[in-house]
Amino acid sequence: MDEVVVNGIRRGDLIMPTTVTSGAAFGLDLDVMDTPRNNTLLSKAQLDALNVQNPGSFSYLTSSSYSDASFGQPNIPRIRGQYADLFLNGMRDSFTLNGYGAPISFNNVESIDIVKGPAAVQAGPGAGVGGSIDVTTKMPSMTKFALTADIEADSQQKRVAVFDVGGPLMDGLAGRLSVQSNDSGSYYHDMFFHQQSIYGALLAEVTSNYTIAFNADYVDTRYREDDGINRVNQALIDNGTYLTGGATSPIAGYGTTVDLTGTTTLNGRTIIDEPDGTGAHAQHIKVQLIQTLRVNDDFSIVNNTLYDYINRYNQIMAYYADTAKGSYTIENKTDFKINFSTGSVKNNLDFGFTYRYAHVLDIQNFANEPVSVYDLSQDPSTFVFPAANQLYGGAIPYTAADGRIQYGVPGSYAAYANDTIDSNLQDGAIFLEHRMQFSPQFSLLYGLRGDLVQLNDSDPLYNQGIAAGLGPDGANGFCPTYCMSLPESQHTSWYGLYNGNISLVYSPVEQVSAYLTYNKAQYVDANANDGAVGTLGVDPTTQLRQGTLLIEGGLKFDLLNKSLFISTAGFKQERAVPVGVGGSQHSQAHITGAEIEANYQPSARFFATASYSYLHTTLDTPSGFWNYPAQMGSNFDGAATGIVWDSNQTFQDPGIPQHLFNVLANYKLENGLGFQANLQVTGPIETTQSGYINLTDSTNVPQYLIDNGGDYKSPKIPWQFTLNAAAFYTFLDHYTAKFSIYNLTSEHNLVNDYPFYGNDFITRVPPRSYDLTFTAKF
């Protein structure tokens, strides 16, 4: 982003989006007032103020952004109720899908631009059509050296150190190195998060009009997934009452009978992931080269290349396991940016072409994850799925990343089709974005993009599965569902995709702008972890040609000499959303909502941000789930998969709050002492789908639902709030000590998980914690 300093505020302290331009939304460098989307620019000052370490914290700084637990380490949030796409300096990070996967590091982050709605034509839409998160990475200064050292520790075993240095190396060349070491424990029993990150950047001015920007990032993370606790029901949410009891039949991936006979209150530190053998390791490498040739003030060429590599595994002894083994993406994109005039009309063009190749080898096993059978009041050694029963559920041993032996289900096993897949996707595209400024009041922006995509996918466990007896010949009459009845591989044809947008912006005065945007696009919808795509046994268009439609309008205000910015937006969006086991089915979602955001910074001593969003999502077909809420007596694990819903009813999308509000205030005295406060409020959240059940056609329905006529109401997390506060002191011009209190009132807050497991996993937010950070800057 290009810097514009106002009101005497130093670059590092600026939070006003009107003081910068950004190309994240449309590829053109636009002021936020001229951008016909609701976009939020998160500056370094805002990210540091809340110590943002993962996308779950975005909900404290922007509207319509909410992250469910994502099995412990969300790597993308939901925006407007849908998962988002992640970009690095304008280039897509392919290894995201539903928030689950390798944890990301913020060691390389300078600022973040969050654009609500699907990515425009320059970036190309992906499965995360809720919004795009474009990370602008740290770059060195050509004129001065800077050094920052940061040490942080808290009362819940957080231990983080950062060293960041950069500046000119020689005439026309600058470099920067940032190293972060996170060696944290956890509030929860036997949990840890150890992440080492090394980021480096070089900036070379080869000539006065040719620059090269290079960055590389290596992140190594060893951790344990945090799935929270099981046996979710309303009493557990309301007062912590946990039902105890064990399995009365052999533990299997489906159909285990569990007799719940007692109650207790679990220690708040208890989670299901405590057994020995549970663990995860992820290695993530990103290398990027950006070349810019400025032919003149009105014509430039930008070539951007990103190589993205991931190698990881995860195993939960309860049992879940997956791996992304030796997976990588490489993309090269060339933009031609031209400014010209035709009569009185000023034109800005960004057109170009791109090619991306994505190889993801993903192996999963959630076939043997009978979450409700484990009694978390017992010894953690009992939270283990019997290895001898893995084959019965379709899982076989294989070698995951790092040579680790885990159990996985072949992708051609029909009951869990394509959840294991060796995916090789090609995507070539051309694009055009054109802005026409007719007068100071009126501008029109339109964009067009065409993609050609082709997929080669195969089952990496096919031969092993056949040898283990999972093929049709060894299925004992359970085919075609519970056997490897799907083909080993598929090579699709080339498919064409379109993407188009048109926007009108009207500014009656310089301080006010109004916009209306229409965006319709097709995209590839990944259906396995880490962005893998599988089409074994299905029509490839179900994954390679999904669609979304967005209509959005808004008002923006730049007031009080650029010290107050207010943005409002209303929108309607339609898209296909993944539902059910593994997200293998689709439902059409109809999303409406409204957002308001405000930034206020009258001086370098004070800033404040606030936002509110309302979201309402209706599904054409219901979102299924695994278990009914836990109840006293006999429970049948996986019983809710037997639900048949009554027709002629409306289904609301579960798992996200309709209302989200946040506010942040930061005040600094002239003597270096400062204070900070932050509040987040979330509306009620249903853990699973609610609705009327067809009792005649459904199976394994609990008696209480039969008695009330099949009116199923999901457990609901009530209104919640989190209040954080901090005091800091800057002294001797270079040093800052900051004392923070998170969850100041020690609220018993809860975070839901993916709605399919909404009655199986729920996470308690840790109680009040104390954090001390010391920073030195030179």
PLM features per residue range, with description:
Residues S67, I76, R92-K116, T136:
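Short acidic/polar hinge/loop motifs at secondary-structure boundaries
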Residues V287-Y309, K325-Y462, S507:
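Face-selective signature of the C-terminal outer-membrane beta-barrel domain
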Residues K337, N348-L349, L549-G553, F607, ...:
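Conserved C-terminal beta-signal and adjacent last beta-strands/turns
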Residues N107-E110, Q122-G200, V206-Y210, I285, ...:
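Outer-membrane beta-barrel translocator/receptor signature
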Residues E205, K346-A358, I421-R575, I591, ...:
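Structural signature of Gram-negative outer-membrane beta-barrels, strongest in the C-terminal barrel
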Residues S563-A576, Q585-L695, D733, T745-S746, ...:
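Gram-negative outer-membrane beta-barrel transporters
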Residues M1-A45:
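Short, acidic, small-residue-rich periplasmic hinge/interaction motif at the N-terminus
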Residues N182, S186, L203-E205, N209-Q288, ...:
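Acidic/polar loop-and-plug regions of large Gram-negative outer-membrane beta-barrel proteins
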